[in-house]
């Protein structure tokens, strides 16, 4: 069973920010600009510029490139209206540079958390996501899933397996 740290991925994964088979970004800045706009458009953040700055600030603290075609950029700021996770699967990978580390990225999980949120909420979401990413079944799911509903069902199945 995946350790959830009090966070259920099914509760924080955002349907409107599950974007499958998008054309690759040219760079991380284009990704951050795009995702900040999507988070604002869908009512997750009140100010896309503030959220983009929060993403960039977090990048200055350490890498969000995880290897294996995965990046987990995240931002904490008061402009986050509701905590959530967006998932983007690209058609092809692009070069993602992050705090001195770089590599190809095709799967992106973007976290938005209010800076005044619950005790270490962002760390608990990250820890839960890391638990999923260690599961071969979850990796297969993120590679092959065709819809948010399919991704959600797979997450719920994995969460209840012993």
Each predicted region: which residue ranges?
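Cytosolic covalent-transfer regions centered on His/Cys nucleophiles
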Residues: 1-162
């Amino acid at each position: 069973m995946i350790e959830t740290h009090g966070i259920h991925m099914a509760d924080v994964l955002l349907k409107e920010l599950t974007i499958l088979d998008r054309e690759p970004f040219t760079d991380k800045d284009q990704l951050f600009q795009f995702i900040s706009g999507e988070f604002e458009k869908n009512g997750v953040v009140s100010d896309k510029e503030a959220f983009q700055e929060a993403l960039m600030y977090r990048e200055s603290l350490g890498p969000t490139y995880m290897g294996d075609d995965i990046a987990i950029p995240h931002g904490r700021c008061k402009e986050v209206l509701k905590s959530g996770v967006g998932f983007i699967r690209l058609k092809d990978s692009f070069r993602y540079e992050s705090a001195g580390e770089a590599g190809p990225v095709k799967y992106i999980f973007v976290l938005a958390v209010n800076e005044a949120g619950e005790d270490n909420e962002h760390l608990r979401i990250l820890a839960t996501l890391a638990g999923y990413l260690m599961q071969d079944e979850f990796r297969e799911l993120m590679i092959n899933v065709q819809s948010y509903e399919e991704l959600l069902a797979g997450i719920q199945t994995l969460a209840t397996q012993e």
